[in-house]
C-alpha cells in the first residue's frame, strides 16, 4: 500500500541549481519559440470541450506555469501548443521531446522517478473500484474469481497484480486502452469491476447516462499523488516549474483553481464534482515539496 506523503519539509528543500545551468528543455523552447503541453482525457484534470479546447484543473495549473516560463525566459511571444497523449503514450511523448510538460492525472512514484521528474503534487487520490450498483460487491474479497478491468500503463495494473498474488483472488485482469474504455466494459457487463483512482471514477460516473446505476466501493488500496511531469535531470527548467507551483500555493491561487474544478459546475455538462479539498492535499500544501513517500 502506498503511504501518504511524508517527510514534509520547508519550501527550502526545493532549492535547485541556478537557471544558468539550464538543460535541454529551455534550449528547445528558445529554439522553437514554443512550449508543448501534453494533455489527456481525464476530466476534471485535463480534457477538451465541444470545441476541442483543452481545459481542466491540471491544464489551468500548467497554463500558469507556462506564463512563468514565458516571463522567466523573457519570451513574450512564446507559443503554447497542446499535444494529446494517453496513459500509454504520455511517457514516450515526454522522453522523445514531443511534449515538455504532461498535465493530466499522472501519479508521482519512485518507479517513474527513475525516468522522469515531477513537481509538487496538486492532488491526492485513492484507488477504489467502480461496480454496478446492484452487483452486491462492497469490497475487494468479493472480486474473487471475477473479471476486473483497469486502464493499461497505469499504476493500478501493478497494484491489482500484487493484490491478486497476495490475496489469491484469482481475478481475471483485462486492460482498457483508456479510462473511458474501462468504464464501458463495466457498463456493458463485460467486467465486474473497474479499479482506478477514485476521483476519476466519480467523474466517469457523473458523466454517464445513468450515474445511479454505478457504485464506487472498496477500502482504499493506495494513495496516488498527482504531479505535473517533466524530463529528468533538467534542473533549470524544473526550478521554474517548482517556483511557480510554490507561488500558486503561497498566494492561495491553487485553492481558487481547485474550487473552480471540484466544487462548482464545470463544462461541458455543468456537472459539479462536489469534492472539497481533502485533508491530505490541504496538509501537504502547508509544507510544499516535490518529495513524496511511496
What are these regions (language model features)?
Residues 22-102:
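Extracytoplasmic small-molecule ligand-binding "clamshell" domains
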Residues 26, 131-148:
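Flexible hinge/capping segments at coil-to-helix
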Residues 34-41, 55, 141-157:
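Short loop->beta-strand "edge-of-pocket" segments that line small-molecule binding or catalytic clefts
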Residues 38-43, 83-88, 97-109, 133, ...:
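Beta->alpha turn/N-cap motifs
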Residues 40-41, 122-134, 198, 206-245, ...:
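Periplasmic-binding protein-like
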Residues 48-51, 63-78, 156-175, 205-210:
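Ligand-binding cleft/hinge of the Venus flytrap
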Residues 75-92, 135, 173-184, 188, ...:
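Short helix-initiation/N-cap motifs at beta->coil->alpha
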Residues 89, 103-114, 159-164, 184-222, ...:
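A ligand-binding cleft/hinge motif common to bilobed small-molecule-binding domains
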Amino acid at each position: 500500500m502506498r503511504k501518504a506523503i511524508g517527510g514534509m519539509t520547508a519550501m527550502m528543500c526545493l532549492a535547485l541549481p541556478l537557471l544558468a545551468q539550464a538543460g535541454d528543455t529551455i534550449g528547445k523552447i528558445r529554439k522553437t519559440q514554443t512550449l508543448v503541453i501534453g494533455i489527456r482525457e481525464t476530466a476534471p484534470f485535463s480534457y477538451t470541450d465541444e470545441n476541442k479546447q483543452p481545459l481542466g484543473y491540471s491544464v489551468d495549473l500548467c497554463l500558469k506555469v507556462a506564463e512563468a516560463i514565458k516571463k522567466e525566459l523573457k519570451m513574450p511571444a512564446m507559443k503554447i501548443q497542446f499535444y494529446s497523449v494517453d496513459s500509454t503514450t504520455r511517457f514516450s511523448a515526454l522522453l522523445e521531446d514531443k511534449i515538455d510538460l504532461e498535465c493530466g492525472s499522472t501519479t508521482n512514484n519512485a518507479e517513474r522517478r527513475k525516468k522522469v521528474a515531477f513537481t509538487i503534487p496538486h492532488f491526492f487520490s485513492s484507488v477504489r473500484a467502480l461496480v454496478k450498483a446492484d452487483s452486491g460487491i462492497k469490497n475487494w474479497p468479493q472480486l474473487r474469481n471475477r473479471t476486473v478491468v483497469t486502464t493499461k500503463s497505469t499504476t493500478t495494473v501493478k497494484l491489482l497484480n500484487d493484490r491478486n498474488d497476495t490475496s489469491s483472488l484469482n481475478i481475471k485482469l483485462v486492460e482498457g486502452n483508456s479510462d473511458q474504455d474501462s468504464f464501458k466494459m463495466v457498463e456493458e457487463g463485460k467486467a465486474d469491476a473497474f479499479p482506478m483512482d477514485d476521483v476519476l471514477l466519480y467523474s466517469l460516473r457523473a458523466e454517464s447516462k445513468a450515474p445511479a446505476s454505478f457504485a464506487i466501493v472498496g477500502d482504499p488500496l493506495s494513495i496516488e499523488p498527482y504531479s505535473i511531469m517533466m524530463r529528468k535531470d533538467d534542473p533549470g527548467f524544473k526550478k521554474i516549474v517548482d517556483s511557480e507551483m510554490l507561488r500558486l500555493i503561497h498566494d492561495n491561487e491553487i485553492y481558487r483553481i481547485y474550487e473552480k474544478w471540484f466544487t462548482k459546475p464545470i463544462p461541458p455538462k455543468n456537472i459539479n464534482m462536489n469534492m472539497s479539498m481533502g485533508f491530505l492535499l490541504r496538509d501537504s500544501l502547508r509544507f510544499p515539496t516535490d518529495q513524496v513517500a511511496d
